[in-house]
């Protein structure tokens, strides 16, 4: 589980006029807090009741909403509340002991399908964490048949909308074609550090 790339999120917000963010996989709430420092409205979806209640107890900020449930079930209704393009930080997968989702370890393709059904999908940004887990069978204790391949992730991202797709470090990036120069600028900046 990597951290939300804040500088990239800011660049995309400014370039594309994004005013909201959605995170799948709250875990300890760091990602939600980081996104809230960039966006006025943030929703973070968590399947583990223990992690959800801990985040609700320990983290509070105006415009930040924690949502309990399966991202696959929650996203369609949530997307009706978001009237503009958004940044999606997709990190809602089973990560071993202390996390939820062992029955469906990686609902990523279903999350993408839910986002793609939204009228704002063509202008939204999808940042998918843990790209390394799609390059081959994930390590134990994961069930390989629960995880899509990198090609199936990329194919799903291309199915309904024209997007610029790339990988950077441990992240799949899917943005509207107009944001390609933003991604290239981010690459150059990060690569020189």
Predicted regions and their residues:
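A short alpha-helical cap/connector motif
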Residues: 1-87, 93-193
